[in-house]
């Protein structure tokens, strides 16, 4: 009602809505106070709206934009202001969002927005230019990023009325954004961070602490381990540079250096040191509301449990909490960490749907996290036995990793591809790839990346010296976690006819979960769950009403 009152300026919207929705099969009242309209009704309403004079349409769209912006729904606000041709307002929304929700759009949508705004309007919004520069970097649109920088500098020159403080903040923040052109070269990035810090008296506007720090990557170490043999130096550089970055961004990415330290310790098999660094990271980010860093901590913690021989599950309560925040990136990070861990444990059915069904192409991942996502998908392919798919995609993925100086991700992909060749009986190819992987891992003693796929490579690993033997030993510990996971799901003989998916549904039915809860845990729709339940009853020859069949299924499970 509140939104309708604001958009229409009608005082009696409550009565109008009541009349429109009472006993109307085309409208459903939602628990939160909103409404769901049948697509036919929406089409009719849209047709009537399109018949209004253009100026009247623009007035309503501008009101939509204002309402959405005031309620933090920046993407909807941006769309509405664009339809109204209100480019100044659209750029104000870009500034307010600080590029956080903007990341969910396709790059082409934002490029079209820039073209429609025009340079003169853009130069009146220098802070929005900073936000757009950073987003262009994450989309790999570097020439456009440089064009926006030129507009920013021209804007500063054309506004002699700016105070020295305003000018310093804009130029300093420009240095901060330009540092991303040296992404994952910690020394060069820090040089520009220090330059920004010298010029800025206020905190950055284009980077907010509530936004993503890892661009969607679940790991800090995968982003910043650049050169084999230089891990200790990279950790020291990160320790040195982050305080300067925190100063000008209000603590954006707080705890990143501790997470990287913990991930490095885990990669080297120093589990106690990794656990200490993890707790320090959690203490650093406590109360900051930085979900990105908390999710990276979760990933480190799950892999620590696995390295200790424990099975880890998918924390669906945590996922529901993230879902309520309406930030797709947090969900994708969560799904990627769950996918990787469940794949390493060999629990293919528990892998989130985005990765299990290989739908990564439906998501607009930011460029810096794409190699990590594809590496995790590789791990899923291994768990599913799709070894040829791993091999087929490895050449392009390795080239991408090398081009971005992602030494750790490259190491993982080499090991995965070696595992795929070994499973297909191609020992010579597997040994050559494992030799390349060992050459990357040896200088820094990175044992865990080899161990996490050790169950595929156990016969080969001992041939690679102390590192290989340690990896083989750790892989046996990891196998305990896989064994524990399998024991948790050991299937009685009566359920032998069921597929893995049907068995997963049947287990949850026996635990008296509702269809909605089963759907949530297995990343299915309720309709699909009902189909599986009918198939289960048919295969197990269970008859009677729904309650009788469910009780009989529980009895079979007990037997």
Could you describe each region identified by the protein language model?
Residues 74-76, 86-87, 125, 162-172, ...:
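Alpha-solenoid helical repeat architecture
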Residues 22, 78, 98-99, 114-119, ...:
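Amphipathic alpha-helical segments of tetratricopeptide repeats
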Residues 71, 84, 104, 139, ...:
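Structural motif corresponding to the intra-repeat A-B loop/turn of tetratricopeptide repeats
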Residues 47, 51-128, 132-135, 148:
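Extended alpha-helical scaffolding segments used for macromolecular assembly and cargo binding
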Residues 374-396, 400-409, 414-427, 431-500, ...:
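Linker/hinge segments immediately adjacent to helix-turn-helix/homeobox DNA-binding domains
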Residues 512-551:
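Recognition helix of helix-turn-helix DNA-binding domains
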Residues 1-50, 59-62:
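C-terminal boundary/linker of central alpha/beta nucleotide-binding cores
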